[in-house]
Amino acid sequence: MDIDPYKEFGASVEVLSFLPSDFFPSNRDLLDTASALDREALESPEHCSPHHTALRQAILCWGELMNLATWVGSNLEDPASRELVVSYVNVNMGLKIRQLLWFHISCLTFGRETVLEYLVSFGVWIRTPPAYRPPNAPILSTLPETTVVRRRGRSPRRRTPSPRRRRSQSPRRRRSQSRESQC
């Protein structure tokens, strides 16, 4: 069976393969990012989005793969064979998991359309001969201001505002209250 885990999201394994393998952060960094950004949604018994479901599956698969690697490391006596297995898991399976984690975290952070546009623009850039392309690759974080603002509004990260923020907002509240009383 030829299963493409990105198909339902409008992408493909081929499109993600345009990004070089060293582009993707380590699995540990990606897992930490997923936990920091979406821990509640990932641990929730309720369905949040297809990206959250895919992230859960990728995280579970990576955990099982690490269990297998630990078992192999403990039970395979030949050091050369053990090293081959560990290397294969880290290089091949690790890259696939890093791609999956990066894609779904990016979609949740920046929006699916922005990530797909980025993948297409990077694919065009990388396939253009160096003499004819701009020197710098497209950057995913170069987003319209509205996308960044909208994302921050959806996920309350801080329970209480910082003291500096509280001070800057209190005069506004007073002004708006005084305007209401004037109307």
Curated annotation (Swiss-Prot):
Phosphoserine found at: S155, S162, S170
Pfam families, alphabetized: Hepatitis_core
Annotated TM spans: none
Residue windows of the Sequence repeats: 155-161, 162-169, 170-177
GO biological process: microtubule-dependent intracellular transport of viral material towards nucleus; symbiont entry into host cell; viral penetration into host nucleus
Biased composition (Basic residues): 149-176
Main location: virion
Motif (Bipartite nuclear localization signal): 158-175
InterPro entries, per database record: Hepatitis_core (IPR002006), Viral_capsid_core_dom_sf_HBV (IPR036459)
Post-translational modification: Phosphorylated by host SRPK1, SRPK2, and maybe protein kinase C or GAPDH. Phosphorylation is critical for pregenomic RNA packaging. Protein kinase C phosphorylation is stimulated by HBx protein and may play a role in transport of the viral genome to the nucleus at the late step during the viral replication cycle.
Record-level Gene Ontology MF annotations: DNA binding; RNA binding; structural molecule activity
Keywords: Capsid protein, Cytoplasmic inwards viral transport, DNA-binding, Host cytoplasm, Host-virus interaction, Microtubular inwards viral transport, Phosphoprotein, Repeat, RNA-binding, T=4 icosahedral capsid protein, Viral penetration into host nucleus, Virion, Virus entry into host cell
Coiled coil: none
Start and end residues of each stretch annotated as Disordered: 136-183
GO CC annotation, single: host cell
Region (3 X 8 AA repeats of S-P-R-R-R-[PR]-S-Q) location: 155-177
Region ranges (RNA binding): 177-183
Location(s), subcellular: Virion; Host cytoplasm
Quaternary structure annotation from Swiss-Prot or TrEMBL: Homodimerizes, then multimerizes. Interacts with cytosol exposed regions of viral L glycoprotein present in the reticulum-to-Golgi compartment. Interacts with human FLNB. Phosphorylated form interacts with host importin alpha; this interaction depends on the exposure of the NLS, which itself depends upon genome maturation and/or phosphorylation of the capsid protein. Interacts with host NUP153.
Family (UniProt): Belongs to the orthohepadnavirus core antigen family.
Function: Self assembles to form an icosahedral capsid. Most capsids appear to be large particles with an icosahedral symmetry of T=4 and consist of 240 copies of capsid protein, though a fraction forms smaller T=3 particles consisting of 180 capsid proteins. Entering capsids are transported along microtubules to the nucleus. Phosphorylation of the capsid is thought to induce exposure of nuclear localization signal in the C-terminal portion of the capsid protein that allows binding to the nuclear pore complex via the importin (karyopherin-) alpha and beta.
Protein name per its UniProtKB record: Capsid protein
Source species of the chain: Hepatitis B virus genotype C subtype ayw (isolate China/Tibet127/2002)
Gene behind this protein: C
